[in-house]
Amino acid sequence: MDKLKKPILTEKSISLLEKRQYTFELDKNITKSEAKKMIETHFQVKVIHMNSYYLPINKKIRKNIGKLKRKKRMIFTLKVGDSIPFSSINMN
């Protein structure tokens, strides 16, 4: 679970919950097959579809001028009847 960083709770991701789609931030080196196995074993659900994307790189302006780390997110679509309760998500 160290490669699965945290669930994403934005306005868009909350609206996707109605379609059984869950958004997570992941380690940038993880593959789709590794992420699918991790979600299925940890939450005991069946993943039927996945989309991955990187957030755009932003520049720091305050103390140091440079680029922030690139972040990878994945949207997992679950089988009908499956869900991930947010009370079971512990990212510590």
Curated annotation (Swiss-Prot):
Pfam families: Ribosomal_L23. SUPFAM superfamilies: Ribosomal proteins S24e, L23 and L15e. One of its GO terms (biological process) is translation. GO terms for molecular function: rRNA binding; structural constituent of ribosome. Belongs to the universal ribosomal protein uL23 family. Part of the 50S ribosomal subunit. Binds to 23S rRNA. This is Large ribosomal subunit protein uL23c. It comes from Chara vulgaris. The lineage of its organism: Eukaryota, Viridiplantae, Streptophyta, Charophyceae, Charales. The gene is rpl23.
